[in-house]
């Protein structure tokens, strides 16, 4: 990157040449007028909204955690366009070009009705409401209460050809000089970047923080995030990515307001400065010795937020989005024949309550001891894509940039280095499995390593779901209409002349 830097004096000098420059995909990718439509099946998931339900020994998950406050990270696989038997072979020259996909449109369909789901904790760290206090109340050994609330309202999706990058605050490493003196002290924290995987929790009003490491009492947040890490997309890093693969574009809508104002229980780690630190009377005046206010109460204030109204007038889903110009250098080119769609939506956050009886006999009267309550949450998705066929020329300048960006692309195109042939004569034993011959050579077949194999995604296979008949699908018809590729024909008006009946002549 070319930057102007100061010299030893006060004059800024231009950067030294030459400087490597990353080209936009529009500079070397040629687009064709061939478009395909792809649509997934109806994608459904069912589970418990707060935690995994495990077997008696805890080794097997019987009911997975499925929450409306989770990210859904889809990894959509597309067919290799270079293996297509195109009807018009003049579209590209396989000796000088390679075919790639470009994303031109997407529609993320959401099923199920709009609804508000609540979260909470049966032992929530809440002393009392601090907005309208009628008397001065101190803390006791255990002030936890059963509390629930509706989370912050979030609608968001990020489109790219590599996974979405997230950020969260986590516990940092302590300096060596202070490593042995951290009991009861607040640990240092640092901002970390991680990939957003399917099932990760997003922020519901308590921040993007690793609650598993930084919430010792397991009561500061709700059950669904108390043992999780809440992540937030790192839009700043993805916007400044030199290649722009992680985020072609995104849509985001968040809203919340502080509904209740509480104070935490426990001792204050960073006490209000007083005379003990030479700050007497700077922040408060002490009360008389016979008053309750003599012992100052906890000052760890916090709100529980509310996502407020959920309405169909402010929905990001079930509507098409067209990609004309991406925010980065990659203008929608799907390297590796895959697209990553990361979704966060809790506007369909209804949790089903299912009640069953524990008695085999018919129940005549209501008895809560004989009724068992269950919680379930369901989600429904369907993803539609408009793909454009594009050509990449196999010239040195283009291949050098693609190789620097991702050398695996050239391997998929079978453009790697071809070694010289070895000796054509090999030893072939007939009875290789018998005890009379040597052990067979343990040569494992080499497979291409998946760079995203260690991450968890909702895999969607669309390798056999592409169609050229765009007018047969809802998103395809919308694309043809907005692109001006198809106009609605008016019916031809025809007029039929009717002859008048001849009058009979009177005789």
From Swiss-Prot:
**Entry's Gene Ontology cellular component terms:** host cell nucleus; T=7 icosahedral viral capsid
Q: Which domain of life is it from?
A: Viruses
Which keywords does the record carry?
A: Capsid protein, Disulfide bond, Host nucleus, Host-virus interaction, Late protein, T=7 icosahedral capsid protein, Viral attachment to host cell, Viral penetration into host cytoplasm, Virion, Virus endocytosis by host, Virus entry into host cell
Q: Name one GO molecular function term.
A: structural molecule activity
The cross-references to InterPro entries, in alphabetical order and at most eight, read: Capsid_L1_Papillomavir (IPR002210), Capsid_L1_sf_Papillomavir (IPR036973), dsDNA_vir_gr_I_capsid (IPR011222)
The listed locations are: Virion; Host nucleus
Name the principal localization, coarsely classed.
virion
UniProt keyword Disulfide bond present: yes
Q: How does it assemble?
A: Self-assembles into homopentamers. The capsid has an icosahedral symmetry and consists of 72 capsomers, with each capsomer being a pentamer of L1. Interacts with the minor capsid protein L2; this interaction is necessary for viral genome encapsidation. Interacts with protein E2; this interaction enhances E2-dependent replication and transcription activation.
Q: Which family does it belong to?
A: Belongs to the papillomaviridae L1 protein family.
Q: What does this protein do?
A: Forms an icosahedral capsid with a T=7 symmetry and a 50 nm diameter. The capsid is composed of 72 pentamers linked to each other by disulfide bonds and associated with L2 proteins. Binds to heparan sulfate proteoglycans on cell surface of basal layer keratinocytes to provide initial virion attachment. This binding mediates a conformational change in the virus capsid that facilitates efficient infection. The virion enters the host cell via endocytosis. During virus trafficking, L1 protein dissociates from the viral DNA and the genomic DNA is released to the host nucleus.
- Name of the protein: Major capsid protein L1
Source organism (scientific name): Human papillomavirus 9
